[in-house]
Amino acid sequence: LKRLLWQLYRMPGRQNRQLEQRCSQLYAAWGIPQGDVNAGYLSCAVGIACSTSQKLAIRKEILQAVSEQFDTSVAAVESGIRRMVDQLEEKPTPAWLAFKADTRLGSGKPTTGKLIYAVRDVVLRQKSP
């Protein structure tokens, strides 16, 4: 399943490029520099979550597949995404605060799973150009 999900995510085509662009635009608005490896982990996880309508297990399915693609551990991927959240929470931009309000993530730090699915929902809602 993990390999299938990754293959679906990595399928060449317009939809995948649009997903990556939407994620990059969102992160840029949050103040995350382009090319940030932790943002790459999150984008990859969002792509996997977008590839199916079923709710996937965060560690066993999503983060495991991300770790395989980046040739690192699940713990490193999860820690990287958490560090990104810590950075955003330490100096929150108006765009980050608006994202949290829009997605009902609350005032505290979102969990990795909630963040993945919140980003997925936002990028899927955006209209295609």
Question: What does each of the following model-derived ranges do?
Answer:
Residues A75:
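Recognition helix of helix-turn-helix DNA-binding domains
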Residues L1-P12:
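Receiver (REC) domain switch/output surface
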Residues L8-Y9, N16, L124-K127:
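Intrinsically disordered, low-complexity regions in plant nuclear regulators
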Residues R59-I62, E68-F70, S79-R82, E89-P129:
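C-terminal engagement/docking regions of AAA+ P-loop ATPases
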Residues N16-T72, I81, V85, E89:
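C-terminal output/effector regions of signal-responsive regulators
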